[in-house]
């Protein structure tokens, strides 16, 4: 018995843990910012790209390395010298061999950069690339916020549509039952009954389609919120109870720079830094170096012998490099960087105009939806009352079926218009709030 109770408690706690209740679109946006897989992946990539700072800083720091070389001189250089220098006869020559066949050298080398302007420019380019990555994350967050707002309201819209369609189906069922009774009594013809029955079937099919759309929207919303398909997501808000704001004047358009524009601005700055870096390639570089080497030369492979000498070589100096001619490569790179800068500036101007147009379009859509909302709500209430009145009249025989059908179709049109209008109001209102940083 205790084991069954324990299992029940575990199952209950699992169900509670997997159920997510969202009461507002702001909660949905906060959850998406915390748990969206794409955002989390972008944050991890940002941390990985942070290591690029160390990679670009390395050429400006001292470098040290240990090295060892083994050479086998299978053909040593030979020089002819007069034999008289070696005690021979004048006019004769002796051949002298230079070096030994087996050479082993090992040592340490340290290099310290003194002047390297292109490498310092690379640091600025790396920092700018990291800023671009941050701006790309802001663009991704903005896109996910917009998608979340649209899917959140689409889910509420389809849920409301299901509720209204269920009421329509209930009225169609009642009408079909009345028509069936009249058909059995011979009051109406089979044609009228079949038409009523067809409306009932069509309404049932619309209900199934709305239920499918609701499930799809809910699953897509789970995906954006970082939930598994098996997790439970409950939206407790009712759009009809949320207060709608007033029209938004043009002066209240979002003043914050859109992330898309900021991203293009950072790309323009990157192009400027890259152009400057290509120009710095003309500057010379200066580095100091020191090298210490121990070398052994043998006639046989006996380097482990302690009786043979090792020779020490030490050197320190400065290396100055000034590129004079590179076959036109520097000029080509500078020209390419200039063209990339112009392309980035063009993209920035286009993106700024695009975002301004988009903001204006959202504002106009929202204002139009606000103006139409009250009219559509009144129209919906009137059409709902008309359906009830028409059903009573049809039941009492005062209305023909065609008259009732006209009223019913008008009610369907009013319902769809009201739901779409309500959804447009809150979707565009939420998007404007997101773009205002609220």
Write out the residue ranges for each language-model feature.
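Small/polar, glycine/serine/threonine/aspartate-rich low-complexity segments that form flexible
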Residues: 20, 67-108, 238-245, 290-322
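Outer-membrane beta-barrel pore domains and translocons
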Residues: 67-73, 111-113, 158, 168, ...
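Short segments within alpha-helical structural elements
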Residues: 58, 205-227, 380-438
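Sec/SRP-type N-terminal targeting helices
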Residues: 40-44, 57, 101, 114-141, ...
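Bacterial Sec-pathway N-terminal export signals of envelope proteins
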Residues: 16-69, 75, 229, 235-274, ...
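Periplasmic alpha-helical coiled-coil/stalk elements that build and connect Gram-negative outer-membrane
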Residues: 27, 137, 141-255, 365, ...
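Bacterial Sec-dependent N-terminal signal peptides
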Residues: 1-25, 425, 437
């Amino acid at each position: 018995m205790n084991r069954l109770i324990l299992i029940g408690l575990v199952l209950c706690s699992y169900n509670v843990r997997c159920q997510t209740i969202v009461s507002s679109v702001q909660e949905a946006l906060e959850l998406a910012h915390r748990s969206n897989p794409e955002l989390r992946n972008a944050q991890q990539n940002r941390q990985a790209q942070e290591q690029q700072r160390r990679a670009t800083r390395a050429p400006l720091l001292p470098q040290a390395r240990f090295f060892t070389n083994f050479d086998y001189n299978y053909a040593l250089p030979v020089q002819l010298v007069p034999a008289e220098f070696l005690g021979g006869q004048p006019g004769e020559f002796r051949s002298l061999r230079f070096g030994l066949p087996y050479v082993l050298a090992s040592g340490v080398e340290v290099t310290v950069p003194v002047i390297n302007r292109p490498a310092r420019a690379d640091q600025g380019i790396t920092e700018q690339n990291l800023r671009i990555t941050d701006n790309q994350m802001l663009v991704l967050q903005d896109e996910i916020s917009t998608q979340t707002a649209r899917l959140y309201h689409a889910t509420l819209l389809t849920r409301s549509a299901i509720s209204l369609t269920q009421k329509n189906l209930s009225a169609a069922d009642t009408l079909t039952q009345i028509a069936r009774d009249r058909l059995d009594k011979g009051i109406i013809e089979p044609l009228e009954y079949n038409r009523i029955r067809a409306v009932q079937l069509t309404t049932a099919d619309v209900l199934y389609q709305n239920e499918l759309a609701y499930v799809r929207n809910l699953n897509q919303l789970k995906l954006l919120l970082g939930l598994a398909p098996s997790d439970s997501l409950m939206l407790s808000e009712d759009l009809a109870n949320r207060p709608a704001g007033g029209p938004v004047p043009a002066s209240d358009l979002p003043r914050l720079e859109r992330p898309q524009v900021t991203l293009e601005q950072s790309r323009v700055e990157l192009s400027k830094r890259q152009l400057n870096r290509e120009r710095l390639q003309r500057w010379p570089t200066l580095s100091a170096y020191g090298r210490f080497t121990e070398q052994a030369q043998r006639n046989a492979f006996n380097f482990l012998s302690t009786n043979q000498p090792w020779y020490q070589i030490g050197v320190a100096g400065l290396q100055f490099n000034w590129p004079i001619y590179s076959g036109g490569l520097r000029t080509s790179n500078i020209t390419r960087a200039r063209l990339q800068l112009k392309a980035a500036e063009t993209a920035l101007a286009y993106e700024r105009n695009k975002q301004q147009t988009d903001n204006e379009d959202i504002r106009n859509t929202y204002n139009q939806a606000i103006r139409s909302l009250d009219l559509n709500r009144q129209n919906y209430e009137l059409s709902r009352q008309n359906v009830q009145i028409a059903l009573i009249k049809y039941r009492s025989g005062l209305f023909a079926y065609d008259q009732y059908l006209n009223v019913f179709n008008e009610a369907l049109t009013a319902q769809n218009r009201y739901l779409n209008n309500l959804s447009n109001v809150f979707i565009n209102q939420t998007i404007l709030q997101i773009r205002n940083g609220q």
